From Swiss-Prot:
Gene this protein is translated from: sbnA
Source species, domain of life: Bacteria
InterPro entries: Cys_Synth/Cystath_Beta-Synth, P-phosphate_BS, SbnA, TrpB-like_PALP, TrpB-like_PALP_sf
Entry similarity comment: Belongs to the cysteine synthase/cystathionine beta-synthase family. SbnA subfamily.
Keyword line: Pyridoxal phosphate, Transferase
Root EC class: transferase
Annotated protein name in UniProt: N-(2-amino-2-carboxyethyl)-L-glutamate synthase
Organism in which the protein naturally occurs: Staphylococcus aureus (strain Newman)
EC number assigned by the record: 2.5.1.140
Length: 326
């Protein structure tokens, strides 16, 4: 038998977590901004954490067996994470998606062998979330031994981030954390990580980054193009009282944020990361220099080549926001 070093894992799933952190010196020279590179998880996003945590919890407690058919509504990243883990564990999976899913994400999910159900009709808020949920309910009623991941209401979602990235952040950052800035959709990541951070840094301010047109914090619903941030419903796992500030960012600002990050730091990240960069740029205009800001970069940029990294898409979003060309 070959003796393995500590760096050699038994399974790809063992490489989920322990993502690196980097300081964004060039982009934010007057503040200490630390970014956790969640896109370096094996499935390419922070969604590997809840996918692994929820499935392994279900298996441990007998809720998921070899005959179980996993069902989930997803804009892409959780679908990829679930598809990866389902393939490794030999489970069946159906992902309910909508037309806003990036073409790359859709191809990856299908490459893992997952079933895909595409909804076409938007819901009353102009998004597709409620339509996707209705399709999930239909599948649950017709598929034997179906198990709904239900990321918007599943307490295991935020717990995965509490025990995962949240714990890793407080173990890495030894100085007081002034601000924790995170994007919201299911709100699992901001709820879980902030709860762990507040245990160690009780004075940390929790800043949620939401999409303009998302209804999570009561904004008026409008059409949104960028997947993976915002929602057309309020997640059950959200506790608004734990959020100190909300910054809304539009699709155009998010795309500019992505491009600034790659220009200044060489980091090629996804659309919600651009939202974070734009939000931090707003935040630092109202705080003292030298603040310690911690954030997360949720997913990889190569999944958004047809969106935030497309000049055609950028011009479309620019026109929609009424930004005048120079």
């Amino acid at each position: 038998m070959i003796e393995k070093s500590q760096a050699c894992h038994d399974s790809l799933l063992d490489s989920v977590g322990q993502t690196p952190m980097v300081q964004l010196h060039q982009l934010f020279p007057k503040h200490e901004v630390f970014a956790k590179l969640e896109y370096m998880n094996p499935g390419g996003s922070m969604k590997d954490r809840p996918a692994k945590y929820i499935i392994e919890h279900g298996i441990k407690h007998g809720l998921i067996t070899e005959n179980t058919h996993l069902i989930e509504s997803t804009s892409g990243n959780l679908g990829i994470a679930l598809a990866m883990i389902a393939k490794i564990k030999g489970l069946k999976l159906t992902c309910v998606v909508d037309p806003k899913i990036s073409p790359t994400n859709l191809k990856i999910i299908k490459s893992y062998g997952a079933n895909v159900e595409m909804v076409e009709e938007p819901d009353a808020h102009g998004g597709y979330l409620m339509t996707r949920i209705a399709k999930v309910q239909e599948l649950l009623a017709t598929i034997d031994d179906a198990y709904w991941i239900n990321q918007y209401a599943n307490e295991l979602n935020w717990q995965s981030h509490y025990h995962g990235a949240g714990t890793e952040i407080v173990e890495t950052i030894k100085q007081p954390i002034d601000y924790f800035v995170a994007p919201v959709s299911t709100t699992g990541s901001i709820m879980g990580m902030s709860r762990k951070i507040k245990e160690v840094h009780p004075n940390a301010q929790i800043v949620a980054v939401d999409a303009k047109g998302s209804v999570i914090f009561g904004d008026k619903p409008i059409n949104r193009e960028l997947p993976g941030i915002g929602a057309s419903r309020v997640p059950e796992i959200l506790n608004r009282s734990e959020i100190n500030q909300v910054i809304h960012v539009d699709d155009y600002q998010s795309a500019l944020g992505c491009r600034k990050l790659i220009d200044y730091e060489g980091i090629f990240a996804g659309g919600s990361t651009g939202s974070i960069i734009a939000a931090i740029e707003q935040l630092i205009t109202s705080i003292e220099e030298g603040a310690t800001i911690v954030t997360i970069l949720p997913d990889r940029g190569d999944r958004y080549l047809d969106l935030v990294y497309s000049d055609t898409w950028l011009e479309k979003m620019k026109s929609r926001q009424g930004v005048k060309s120079e």
